[in-house]
Amino acid sequence: MEKDYLRISSTVLVSLLFGLALVLVNSWFNQPGVEEVVPRSTYLMVMIALFFIDTVAFIFMQLYFIYDRRQFSNCVLSLAFLSCLIYFVITVIIIQQIIEERLTSSVVQNDIAIYYLFRQMSLCILIFLALVNKVSENTKQRNLFSKKMTLCISLFFVFGGPIVAHILSSHYESYNLHIAELTNENGQVVWKASYVTIMIFMWLTLLSVNLYFNGLRYDIWNGVTVIAFCAVLYNISLLFMSRYSVSTWYISRTIEVVSKLTVMVIFMCHIFSALRVTKNIAHRDPLTNIFNRNYFFNELTVQSASAQKTPYCVMIMDIDHFKKVNDTWGHPVGDQVIKTVVNIIGKSIRPDDLLARVGGEEFGVLLTDIDTERAKALAERIRENVERLTGDNPEYAIPQKVTISIGAVVTQENALNPNEIYRLADNALYEAKETGRNKVVVRDVVNFCESP
C-alpha cells in the first residue's frame, strides 16, 4: 500500500511541477501591458488541467461503484465530479468568446463568476448527498431519501444547475445575476462578499459534518476532507482579489489543482487497495489464510512453463488419521489441528516457498531452486517438527500429537504439464501412507517410474 502511494504521489508531483512550469512560462511570455490580469491562455490551461483531473476522479468512482454496487454513495460522489466537468466546458467556451472579442471583459468575468459559484455549490451539495448515503450505509439505518430520489436530486444539480446558471448569466439580461465586476484600476476583478461568504459557509459545514462522521481515516472520505478544506482556503482568497488580483488568482488555483490531485491519489490508492484485498481473498483459504488450490496450480503452471532449467520441487502433505481426530474431538478441534499444522509448516519452509491448502487436510508446497537431497532434508524437517511440536506443547492448544505423510517430486524438465507433476507427487504421498505413514517419500522425476 505504501509503495503504491509513493509511486502515484511521485508521478502526480512530477506532473504538477511540470504543469506549474508551463503556466509560469506562459504567463512570462504573455505579460499584459497595462492591465494586471491573468493571461487567458493560462486560464485555459488551468481549466483544462482541472477538467482532466475531475474526469479521472469521475471514472475511478464510477468503476468503484460498479465494483461494489452496495456503496451507492460512490455513485453520487462520481456525479459531483461530473458536474464540475460540465462547468469547466462552459467556462472554456466563455473564455473563447472573449478571445474572439464577442463579449466585453466585464460581462465575461461576471459570467465566469456565476458558473464558478454554481460549480462550487453543485460540488458541495452533491458531496453532502453522498455523505448522507455513506452515513446510512455505515449505520445500516434507513436513508432520508431513497436511492431513486437521491439519484434524481443529484442529476438535477448535475444538469439542471448549468441551465439555471445560464439563465442568470448575460444571455438573459432581465435575470442577470451580478456577482463580480472589473474595477477601473488595472482591470482587477472584485467579488461581492456575500456570495463568497455563502460558498465558504457551505464548505465549512461540509468539512465539519464529514469530520464528525468519518474522522481522518485513510480512505475516500479523507479525500473529501481535503477537497472541503482547500475549497475554504481558495474561496477565502476571493475576498482579497480587489487588492492582489493576479497573485491571489495563482495561489487560489494552485490550491485547487493540488487539492484535486491529492484527492485523485487518495482515490486511486484506496481503489487499488480494495482490488488487492479482493484478489487476495480469491486466492486465500478462509480457514488458514494460506493460498488455495487454484492459486497453487496457477503458480505450478507458471513454474512448469518456465524456460529456466533450475530444479524445483512439489510436495504434497497429508495429516495422518485426520478423520479419527474429527470423530473423537469434533470439527472445531479438527480445524485447530489444521491451523496448527499449517503454522508449523510455514515456519519450517523458506520465505520464498509457496504453501497452499489443496484439500481438506492436504497441503502443497512449491519450492524453487532446490535439488533432491535438499528437498528430502527439508521434508524430513517439516515432518519432524509437526510430530515434535504438536505433542505437549502449550503454544498449540490441540489435545493430541499428530503426524503427517509427505510425498514429493523434484524436476527441472518442462516437458510435463502441471497435472502430471502433481500426480507424481500424489503417488509419492500414497506410497508414504501405504508404507506406514509419518514418513517422507521424495522422487526425482527422471528416476521415478510408475507401475503400468
UniProtKB/Swiss-Prot annotation:
UniProt note: phenotype after gene disruption: A slight increase in motility. No visible effect on curli production.
Active-site residues, record numbering mapped to chain: E361
Record note on cofactor: Binds 1 Mg(2+) ion per monomer.
GO MF: diguanylate cyclase activity; GTP binding; metal ion binding
One Gene Ontology term, aspect cellular component: plasma membrane
Associated pathway: Purine metabolism; 3',5'-cyclic di-GMP biosynthesis
Compartment(s) of residence: Cell inner membrane
Site (Transition state stabilizer): K323
The keyword Ribosomal protein is assigned to this record: no
Stated consequence of mutating A130V: In strain: K12 / W3110 / ATCC 27325 / DSM 5911
Assembly notes: Homodimer.
Listed NCBIfam families: GGDEF (TIGR00254)
Name this polypeptide is given: Probable diguanylate cyclase DgcT
Lineage: Bacteria, Pseudomonadati, Pseudomonadota, Gammaproteobacteria, Enterobacterales
